[in-house]
């Protein structure tokens, strides 16, 4: 090797080392973001009766067979964006920082709705259509940054003519590349304002001697009704176990249920088929029938249009 060649090799090595140093410095100071734990978690409304979920995971494995793939659920009711939003809020906080979550409930697939990756202040990355799915996670974990997916580079090869399966061709592909370290968060696409499309709902708040809140979800296996009222807010009413809670449930402005329910630690403290108010595993106020289905019995569902008011009846 000539002296000139040695000099060129040395210069190239210095440039590579310099680029590596710059990359590490930017990474250390949070100027670029890499999802490092190789975990991708999926949720969809696809169900498991066909091969759609398998296709999404196959795309991820093709990006990197080292990825670890998990599921939240694929049984979100069809087109139910609100339920997708709730399941994210329910579960994401239990996954380690750096996890990539791919959420696909996308009735507007192929239209002008944006495809984004939201980085939460907790360090999670949510890949999703910006259609309301991010409503609750943006509030609970906070928005660090939002980037629009640049499909000119972050789309599965030769998939441009397919306009109805972005879950496979865009979201799973981009999420896998991010989780595998093939791309940084900055390489997802252009930075957007730190806002997302939000579904309106009643946030939990104290209003005089009442607390107003929302019914974001049902404990669907058992028909328990979950609210977004945290135990700490409920405690401001100074409830006592065994005493009654006055509950009024609305669908839009229509009153669906009114009743006084005993506040209990757990289900077995009341007789079978009797109602109770309790704090659920997410530390939020909930309502149930012991060994029964509260939601079905009283025709209650969940979503942004469902609200609740609670108070403590005055003792005589």
Where are each of the predicted segments found?
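Active-site histidine-anchored catalytic micro-motif
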Residues: 38-39, 51, 62-69, 79-86, ...
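A conserved acidic, glycine/proline-rich C-terminal tail/linker
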Residues: 226-299
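N-terminal secretory signal peptides that target proteins for export/translocation
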Residues: 1-16
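Sec-dependent N-terminal signal peptides
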Residues: 18-27
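Anionic-ligand-binding alpha/beta catalytic cores of soluble enzymes and soluble regulatory domains
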Residues: 159-241
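Boundary at the C-terminal end of the N-terminal hydrophobic targeting segment
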Residues: 33-35
């Amino acid at each position: 090797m000539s002296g000139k060649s040695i000099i060129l090799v040395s210069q190239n090595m210095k440039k590579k080392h310099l680029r590596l140093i710059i990359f590490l410095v930017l990474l250390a100071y949070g100027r670029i973001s890499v999802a490092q734990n190789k975990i991708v978690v999926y949720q969809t409304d696809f169900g498991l009766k066909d091969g759609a979920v398998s296709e999404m995971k196959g795309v991820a494995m093709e990006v990197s067979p080292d990825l670890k793939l998990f599921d939240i659920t694929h049984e979100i009711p069809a087109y139910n964006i609100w339920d997708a939003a709730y399941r994210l809020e329910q579960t994401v906080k239990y996954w380690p920082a750096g996890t990539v979550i791919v959420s696909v409930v996308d009735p507007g697939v192929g239209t002008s709705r944006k495809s984004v990756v939201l980085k939460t202040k907790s360090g999670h990355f949510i890949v999703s259509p910006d259609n309301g799915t991010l409503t609750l996670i943006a509030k609970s974990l906070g928005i660090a940054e939002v980037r629009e997916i640049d499909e000119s580079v972050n789309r599965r090869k030769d998939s441009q003519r397919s306009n109805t399966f972005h879950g496979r061709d865009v979201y799973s592909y981009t999420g896998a590349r991010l989780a595998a370290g093939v791309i940084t968060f900055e390489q997802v696409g252009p930075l957007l304002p730190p806002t997302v499309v939000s579904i309106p709902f009643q946030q939990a708040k104290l209003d005089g001697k009442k607390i107003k809140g929302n019914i974001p979800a049902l404990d669907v296996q058992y028909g328990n009704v979950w609210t977004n009222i945290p135990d700490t807010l409920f405690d401001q009413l100074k409830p006592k176990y065994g005493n009654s809670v006055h509950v009024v449930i609305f669908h839009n402005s229509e009153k669906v249920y009114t009743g006084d329910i005993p506040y209990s630690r757990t289900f077995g403290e009341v007789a079978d088929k009797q109602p109770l108010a309790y704090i659920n595993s997410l530390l939020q106020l909930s309502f149930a029938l012991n060994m029964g289905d509260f939601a079905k019995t009283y025709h209650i569902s969940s979503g942004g249009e469902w609200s609740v008011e609670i108070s403590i009846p005055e003792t005589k």
